[in-house]
C-alpha cells in the first residue's frame, strides 16, 4: 500500500507539532526541527515518539 501524500496536510510531528516531509526512498516522514524520522508501515505513518529514529548527518 502506498503512502498518500495528501496526509501531509493534516499530520504533524507528535513532539513539536511541526510540519513533516515525506522521504520516498526511506519510506519515512521527517521532522527537520526535531531531527526525527517516523516510519511508514504498509502505507500508514507510525507517528509515535518511541518509534521515531534520530536522523544522522548523512540523511
Curated annotation (Swiss-Prot):
InterPro entries: Trm112-like
Coiled coil: none
Annotated disulfide bonds: none
Annotated SUPFAM superfamilies: Trm112p-like
Domain of life the protein comes from: Bacteria
Gene Ontology cellular component list: cytosol
HAMAP family: UPF0434
Family classification: Belongs to the UPF0434 family.
Stated name of the protein: UPF0434 protein Sbal_1685
Amino acid at each position: 500500500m502506498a503512502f498518500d501524500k495528501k496526509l501531509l496536510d493534516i499530520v504533524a510531528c507528535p513532539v513539536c507539532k511541526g510540519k513533516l516531509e515525506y522521504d520516498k526512498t526511506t519510506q519515512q516522514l521527517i521532522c527537520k526541527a526535531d531531527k526525527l524520522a517516523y516510519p511508514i508501515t504498509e502505507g500508514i505513518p507510525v507517528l509515535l515518539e518511541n518509534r521515531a529514529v534520530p536522523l544522522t548527518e548523512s540523511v
